[in-house]
Structure formats: structure tokens, C-alpha cells
Amino acid sequence: MRIRKYDFNYSRRAFLDKMATGAMAAGVLGPLWPLIARAGDITKAYPEELLSIEAYTKGKIKTGDLITADNVEFVKDLLDPVAYVHVSQMGRQIRIVKTTTDATRLFPKKYLDATLRNQGKAQLDADGNVVTTEGKPWIGGNPFPDPRDGLQAFSNLTLSWGRHDNSFYAVRDWDIGPDGDLQYEYDFCWAEQNTTALVGDNGPYMPGHEDKLRFQSVWFTYPNDSKGTSFLNTWYYDQRKFPDLQGYLPAFKRVRRFPTNQRFEPLVPGITLFLSDAWAAGDPMLTWGNYKVIGRQPMLGAVSENWMGPGTNYERPVHGGAKGKTFMETAMELVPETIVIEAEPTGYPRAPV
């Protein structure tokens, strides 16, 4: 007979205790980040129930299973409310894969190295911006691996969206209507270049741009009536400031400045991607306010095994919805610990939320 050291509800009680006491360090059985620094392995920080979907659901869901309307109730508490509706009412399916326990697979190497190297060197200044202990702009990696509050946690997302100094994405966008039919289709490019908090070999700052955080641009290449439409988003390091937003509209053949506080409106007709959506941190973090940590829990997340490869032109198979093309095939895994943060768009009177 095997006697379990930690019963099934041990982690639930641990998360409730963290919320009650305000403790923010990641890890249930022990601190997470020292384990990552030593070997990258997270398994000693969490009990089995948080590392195995089979253990968590007591065998009802296994790695390789599809989450459908028939079994979604077993993982309802691991999904956000919208994803639950997608699966339970709209035919979405989610493939379950094994939990990633090697943290080095979750970050670019230089970014993880900078996070470990710069631990303890970040603070929030009087305005709420992230600075070093010398008062300079941040120098790379997560500034707060073990955040003490919601704002510190959110700064980890905001200062480096994709964890790379620069990134380029080629995107094909399909906008599906409530009836399940394709309403709009776009091809566009999305590019990011950080100017501070850099982790490359040339130092943490781009010379001459230390007052900025990043340049971000998007330009459309299809269809022809939108081809050439482009936008440049210039972020200031001071997160109280709105970015400068400039755009080129082919129909007018000129560059114009757009009101940057209207970040909840589509860039082109029908598209449901907004500037505010980027990396779940698409606005300067101090243009939002009232940050609160409202939960600590495991969740299902799209972390690994979602590479489709060139055989399908990098396009995912689709399913669900009224016409079988509303949702893309997605793999998710049990993420042992997530921080749930609530914030309000205090700087946006026209925000729809």
C-alpha cells in the first residue's frame, strides 16, 4: 500500500492560504525559482495532482484525450469562462498533452538567463514604473519572478511581450460570423523591437531610445483593398504615457496620426484583433489601474505541441461552430500554477469593459 504524502486537496489549501496571507512566491511544495535556477526542473515544486491531468481529474481525463462537450465538466475549473462556453455549447475541442516540467523550454535562453542574473535588481519607482535599484530603465528578463502584487506580475508581461528583443510574425486572419461563415480574411505582418530591457549582446538599451520601451508595427498585404494599410506604435518607457500611433491608409495616400487612446477599435473592417489585445498586455500598464490578484490556481494553457509545420502552410485544421470552421485545433496542458489578475481601464473613458 502506498501512502500519499500530500492528499488530493493539498494544493487547493495551499493556494487558498497564499491568497489569504498575500504570499506571491510561485511553488507549492517549495519555492519555484531556485529550482529553475539549479536545473530548470519544476517537479519538486508541485505535488503530482498539479503535474498530471490524470491525477488531477482522478483518471477521468488522460494525456492524449480530447476535451469535448461530453467531458468538459471534469476540467471546467481549469478553463476560463469563455473557453468553457466554446467547448460546452459551440463544439470546440481541445487536445490534452503532457505538462511541460522543464522550464528552460518556456523561455528563450537569453531571456531566462537575464531573469536569473537580474533577480532582486528591480523595483517600482514612485510613479509605478519598473526601474533598477539605481533608478535606470529595466535591464532584461522578468523584473519580478516572484511578484508581490498584481502590478508587479503584470509588469513581467508588459516589458517584454514575446521574450525576444525583436520578433516578426506572418499572420493569416479569418473572421468568422455568428452564422459560421467567413466574413473577412486578412494577411498581415506584425513586428516588435524592444529598445530597453534588451537581453542581447549589445547591452540592455538601444542607444538614443532609452526613453522608449518598444516599436511595434503591423502592415496588411491582403486583400487588395487593404494592402498597404500599416500602423506604427511607439511605446514610451513611462507607462503612464499613451503610445504614439501613426498609420498609412492607401486610399488617402498619406500618413496620419491616430488617437492612441482608442485602442479597443478594429484596425481594419471586421477584424477582431485590437492593439489592446497584444500578449494580453497591449496597453501601457499604468493606463490601467486597480490591479488585484483574485486567484491562484492550476489552469489549462496552450504551452506546447501546437506547431503545425509547413505541410499545411502552417495553418491549423478547424472545427466547431455553425459551419465547422470557427475554432482552430489547439493542444493544452495542465499548468500547475497561474496568477489570476483583475484590472480596470482607468485611462480609457471609451473602453468597452
What are these regions (language model features)?
Residues 41-242:
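Solvent-exposed N-terminal domain segments of exported/luminal and surface proteins
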Residues 1-40:
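N-terminal secretory signal peptides
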Residues 220-224, 249, 253, 262, ...:
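Short, flexible loop/turn elements at secondary-structure junctions
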Residues 123, 175, 245-248, 343, ...:
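Hydrophobic beta-strand positions
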Residues 232, 237-311:
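Acidic, serine/threonine- and glycine-rich low-complexity intrinsically disordered segments
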Residues 112, 119-120, 189-209, 217, ...:
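Extended beta-strand-rich segments in extracellular/periplasmic secretory proteins, especially
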Residues 22-35, 230-238, 352-353:
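Surface-exposed flexible segments
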Residues 226-228, 255, 352:
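Short, mixed charged/polar active-site loops
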